[in-house]
Amino acid sequence: MKPFPRAEISSSALQNNLAVLRQQARASQVMAVVKANGYGHGLLNVANCLVNADGFGLARLEEALELRAGGVKARLLLLEGFFRSTDLPLLVAHDIDTVVHHESQIEMLEQVKLTKPVTVWLKVDSGMHRLGVTPEQFATVYARLMACPNIAKPIHLMTHFACADEPDNHYTDVQMAAFNELTAGLPGFRTLANSAGALYWPKSQGDWIRPGIALYGVSPVAGDCGTNHGLIPAMNLVSRLIAVRDHKANQPVGYGCYWTAKQDTRLGVVAIGYGDGYPRNAPEGTPVWVNGRRVPIVGRVSMDMLTVDLGQDATDKVGDDVLLWGQDLPVEEVAERIGTIAYELVTKLTPRVAVCLA
C-alpha cells in the first residue's frame, strides 16, 4: 500500500526540465541547484535523476557530503561557501568547490594547511547586497586569492540577481553590466543566471547557469506557471479522503467554527495538515484536486487534517486520492492563493510526508 501523505517525484519530469533549460542556454553548462533536500524533492532522488547535469549547487557542506556518499561524481559547489576552517580539508578530500564571499573565508584559506588547493568561485556583490565582495573590494580580494597557494587557479567568478524574477525590472541589466565590467578579461568560468536568469535574461547565461526552482517544473515569476515554458511539475503532493460526511446548511466545521455551510453539502476530510507542512494559513477556497476537479478547502487547516467541500451531489468516497498540488493543480496557483511562494511550499514538507520516486 502506498503511504499517505506522500510526495511523488517524477524522474521523467525532472529530466524534461533539465532538457528544457539546456535548450534555453545551449552554450552554458548546467549546475543543478539541489539545496534544501532538492527543494523538498529528495536530495539523492533529484541528483540520481539528473545524472546528465554538469554539476550540482548546494547550500551546506553536509549536503555535498551526502551526494558524494551516494556516488555522485559531478562537480559540486557550496553556494554559501564554507563556514569553518575545519571544513576545508573535507572540501579537498571530496573534491568540492566553494564560493568565497567574505574576508573571514579568505583569512582561513590563507592560514590553513592543505594537501592540495581548493577550487574557488569568487562571489561579486553586483547589487543584491547580501553576499559577495563589493566592486571597491574586488581588485584587492582577487589579488589576495591569486597569491594564495591553497586556491586552485583560475579563480571562477559569480554573482546573484536580486530581481531577475521581475522580467520588466531593468535592475538585472544594471547587475549584469556591473559584473561584466568588473570581471572583463579575467580567466575562469562565469555564472550569473539562476532560474529566472536562464528563462528570461538570455544575456546572463554565461559559462554556467544555476537553475533551482525551474528544474522542479515551477516558474520563478509571480503570476507565471512552469508549464508556460515547457516545464513539468516534478512533485505531486498526494493524500486521501479519510472521511466523507453529509453536512447541513448553517452548520460550522473545524476549529473556531470558522466556516459555515450556506447549503446542504458533503464534506471530505483529508489526511494532511500543518504537521505535514501544509500551511495553516491556507484560506477558505484554496483548491485541492479530487477525482478530476478542483474543490475548495473550508474551515481551518489543523495539524493532521483539512476539510474540503465536495458539493451536494459528490460521489467521492473514503480512500480516494487528493492532490494538494502537482501536475493537475500547479503549486504556483496554490501558493498565490495562500499568499506565499511555491519555493516555500515544496521545501517545508515535514518528515511525515513520504518522498518517493513515482
UniProtKB/Swiss-Prot annotation:
Residues the entry annotates as binding substrate: 130, 303
Assigned keywords, A-Z: Isomerase, Pyridoxal phosphate
CDD domains: PLPDE_III_AR_proteobact (cd06827)
Pathway linked to the protein: Amino-acid biosynthesis; D-alanine biosynthesis; D-alanine from L-alanine: step 1/1
Annotated catalysed reactions: L-alanine = D-alanine
Family to which the UniProt record says this protein belongs: Belongs to the alanine racemase family.
Protein purpose: Catalyzes the interconversion of L-alanine and D-alanine. May also act on other amino acids.
Name of the protein described by the UniProt record: Alanine racemase
Native source species: Shewanella sp. (strain W3-18-1)
